């Protein structure tokens, strides 16, 4: 196994060692892969000490190297870097119970912990949240929606709907999402979303109506009929059946642009799956997982 050794700058107390032992099997991100690191390279404290913005922390987390805490030996931690396809015991550091087959992602620690994990002078151990990928995506969608709704309105106008968006229930657990800070980073995400939406809205209807009409000749499904009804209400820049052989390249370019814009939106909301749950302990504190990437 590819072991990484983390040495603490000061001598740990027995209480500190006991706390770390309880975190065995936790996923801990580090900035880069080195065999010897100090405790300041461990976890997300360095990131959170410079920014509290969810989007920015999420982007930095994506670039970090994942390790798994294997053992505590005195003043030293032994971590391993997981390998694709291998199976590991993983500590559930998220708010939700896990089930077999869950795909798991990592998100910034947006929930206020009931207690701090380990606090030393000028440093604190802060871990990401291990969350099912579909829920992680829903969280990102809601955060983006909150940003878009609040960018041109006073908070009082959207307070009720934002409170609803911030409250998320999953598997009988209810969590509260953080407030969104509309700074340069989140504004960039909103610009990306708006540009993508506008290009899809401009290009998609013209090309889609042609395909819907052709498909409806073969399949009279209710979904296709509804699509036709929706498209019939729109005004098109040209007749949908007027594409000529010489315009195939233009049509193809529109299709590719629409798919590119869809991918742009996905990049704002989709999360990478790191683990797939193969089994879960009775108390749901540990999960046997296969490392995906």
From Swiss-Prot:
GO terms for cellular component: host cell nucleus; viral capsid. InterPro entries: Herpes_capsid_2. Keywords: Capsid protein, Host nucleus, Virion. One of its GO terms (molecular function) is structural molecule activity. It comes from the Viruses. It is found in: Virion; Host nucleus. Belongs to the herpesviridae TRX2 protein family. HAMAP family: HSV_TRX2. Interacts with TRX1 and major capisd protein/MCP. Structural component of the T=16 icosahedral capsid. The capsid is composed of pentamers and hexamers of major capsid protein/MCP, which are linked together by heterotrimers called triplexes. These triplexes are formed by a single molecule of triplex protein 1/TRX1 and two copies of triplex protein 2/TRX2. Additionally, TRX1 is required for efficient transport of TRX2 to the nucleus, which is the site of capsid assembly. This is Triplex capsid protein 2. It comes from Human herpesvirus 7 (strain JI). The gene is TRX2.
């Amino acid at each position: 196994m590819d072991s990484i050794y983390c040495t603490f700058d000061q001598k740990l107390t027995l209480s500190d060692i006991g706390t770390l032992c309880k975190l065995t099997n936790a996923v801990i991100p580090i900035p880069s892969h080195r065999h010897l690191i100090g405790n300041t390279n461990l976890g997300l404290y360095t990131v959170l000490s410079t920014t509290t913005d969810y989007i920015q922390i999420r982007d930095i987390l994506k670039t970090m190297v994942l390790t798994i805490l294997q053992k505590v030996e005195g003043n030293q931690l032994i971590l391993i870097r997981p390998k694709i396809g291998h199976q590991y015991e993983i500590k559930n550091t998220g708010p939700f119970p896990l089930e077999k087959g869950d795909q798991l992602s990592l998100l910034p620690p947006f929930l206020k912990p009931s207690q701090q994990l380990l606090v030393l002078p000028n440093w604190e151990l802060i871990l990401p949240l291990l969350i099912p990928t579909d829920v992680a995506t829903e969280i990102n969608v809601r955060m983006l929606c909150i940003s878009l709704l609040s960018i041109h309105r006073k908070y009082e106008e959207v307070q009720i709907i934002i409170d609803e968006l911030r409250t998320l229930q999953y598997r009988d657990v209810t969590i509260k999402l953080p407030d969104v800070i509309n700074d340069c980073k989140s504004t960039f995400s909103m610009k990306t979303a708006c540009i993508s939406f506008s290009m899809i809205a401009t290009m998609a209807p013209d090309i889609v109506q042609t395909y819907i009409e052709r498909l409806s000749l073969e399949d009279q499904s209710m979904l296709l009929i509804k699509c036709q009804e929706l498209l019939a209400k729109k005004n098109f820049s040209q007749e949908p059946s007027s594409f000529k052989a010489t315009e195939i390249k233009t049509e193809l370019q529109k299709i590719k642009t629409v798919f590119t814009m869809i991918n742009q939106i996905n990049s704002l909301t989709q999360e990478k799956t790191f683990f797939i749950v193969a089994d879960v302990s009775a108390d749901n504190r540990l999960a046997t997982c296969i490392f995906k990437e």
